[in-house]
Amino acid sequence: MQYTQQAAAVTAEVNKAVQGKQQTVNTIWMAMLAGGHVLIEDIPGVGKTTLALAFARALDLKESRVQFTPDVLPSDLVGFSVYQKETGKFVYHAGAVMCNLFLGDEINRTSSRTQSALLEVMEEGTVTVDGVTRPVPAPFTVIATQNPIGAAGTQMLPQSQLDRFMVCAVMGYPDEEAELAILAGQSKGRLLDRVRPVAGQADLLAMQQEVSTVFVHELMYRYIVALAQASRKDPRLAVGLSPRATLALTSMTRAAAYLAGRDFVAPQDVTAVFDVVARHRLVLNDQARAGGETVDSVMQDLLRTVPRPRPEKADRHGR
């Protein structure tokens, strides 16, 4: 694993701008290494945007940011064509997603039509304007933030779009020491200005390639599928984990193993990332919600009741 030290340097650099959020930083970094997209859900003012911009700086990525409001149009994201009389041709003007890291702030404040414009980009890595399909630059990651449902001016993202985010991370308030560090650091200048590039686009692509080669034993595949099957049969859930979710869980476990310095996935990798992969995909039914159940309690039950493979069976030589 040639780039593991450089991968660790990225998180160290991002942590300069975001105090006390190591777990959230690791979650986003694993999703980027796995080639996925990230949804960050929390109240305003806890550092969601700063965190995304810190990754763009640490990785020297071309970033673009859109503050989603009801008047943002799909063409603002994917671009548009303009007819030029001089040449008699249509000229394409790139939209905001033509970048390496696209930050969509408060995605659940915009229209469903504009939200849907992200679907092709997130799933296919392309945009289609006037019948012409164009690839987005590689690497490409969407980091979207949303305020909790019920906040003024918000609307629920459709389940089809939620499922396209590999993970959903929650920031939460900083603890007392972290908040004091934020105040002390801010007095010496913007925390984001401390972040320096420690890798580039080519390095990220190389890391993603290394992550894709991390070995997954058949027993680990069976464990992941068993968790998904159990979620679909759980009487408390109206929606369980989709096949796309099992693919996301597998990719995230590879990234977790990679950051741990292993070339194979172990059972602890699955349990470490299960909540961030599953939380936004599982939907409680009305009866469970009325009974006080939570998605978190269901996830804990799934991890407790589905048998885990023995760790020694997980490597390349396991039987």
What are these regions (language model features)?
Residues M32-T69:
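Walker A/P-loop
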Residues D42, D105-E106, A117:
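Walker B catalytic acidic pair
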Residues Q84-K89, T110, T114, M122-V214, ...:
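Canonical AAA+ ATPase core
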Residues Q2-I43:
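Pre-Walker A (pre-P-loop) alpha-helix and adjacent loop at the N terminus of AAA/AAA+ ATPase modules
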Residues N26-M30, Y83-G104:
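Conserved alpha-helical scaffold flanking the Walker A/P-loop in AAA+ ATPase domains
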Residues A58-E86:
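AAA+/P-loop NTPase substrate/partner-engagement loops
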Residues I43, L77, T145:
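P-loop (Walker A) phosphate-binding loop of NTP-binding proteins
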Residues K233-R319:
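C-terminal engagement/docking regions of AAA+ P-loop ATPases
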